Swiss-Prot record:
Annotated metabolic or biological route of this protein: Purine metabolism; AMP biosynthesis via salvage pathway; AMP from adenine: step 1/1
SUPFAM superfamilies with a match to the protein in the record: PRTase-like
Chief localisation class: cytoplasm
Cell location: Cytoplasm
Protein name in the entry: Adenine phosphoribosyltransferase
Glycosyltransferase is among the record's keywords: yes
EC number of the protein: 2.4.2.7
Length: 171
């Protein structure tokens, strides 16, 4: 059964600040059938990978249940200072400043096929940084899966060397 996931995405104008047209995934998360459909779709795309990686925080919402559905490991990518123990850091530039992402040491192994799962592809900057982290660990980015792609922001261009799949495309 096909479900039109776009009807579960609410647009909130001027949030979190004026001029932003925020895509709210809360209605999708609040509907068990739509959420299940989303996870099953993502799992069908990620079935051949070794591990699933997701960024803090909304990548966790889709990456973790997808990994559990496939009985695969889920690895968290977090902002600096949020993971215990020894971590690998990756600094990257944003449009207005810089940021640091972290992953716990030895969570991503050389040769592993990785799927990155996140909620929204906007400018692509954060996910591009995650691809570099994965490749620095010697692993292979096999797929990048998003719930929503905001096509007008052209984030796909930053990820043109990867297999990028979006369940919903909004122009």
């Amino acid at each position: 059964m096909q479900i039109n996931l776009e009807k579960y995405i609410r647009t909130v104008e001027d949030f979190p600040k004026k001029g932003i047209s925020f895509k709210d995934i809360s209605p999708l998360l609040a509907d068990g059938k739509a959420l299940n459909y989303t996870i099953v779709e993502m799992a069908s795309l990620a079935k051949d990978v070794d591990i699933i990686v997701g960024p803090d925080a909304r990548g966790f919402l889709f990456g973790t249940p997808t990994a559990a559905f496939l009985s695969k490991p889920f690895i968290m990518i977090r902002k600096a200072g949020k993971l215990p123990g020894e971590v690998e850091e990756f600094a990257y530039e944003l449009e207005y400043g810089s940021a640091i992402l972290e992953v716990q040491v030895d969570m991503i192994k050389p040769g592993q096929k990785v799927a990155i799962i996140d909620d929204v592809l906007a400018t692509g900057g954060t996910v591009k940084a995650i691809t570099k982290m994965i490749e620095r660990a010697g692993a292979i980015v096999d797929k990048i899966i998003f719930l929503i792609e905001l096509e007008q922001l052209q984030g796909r261009k930053k990820l043109e060397n990867y297999d990028v799949i979006s369940l919903i495309k909004i122009s």
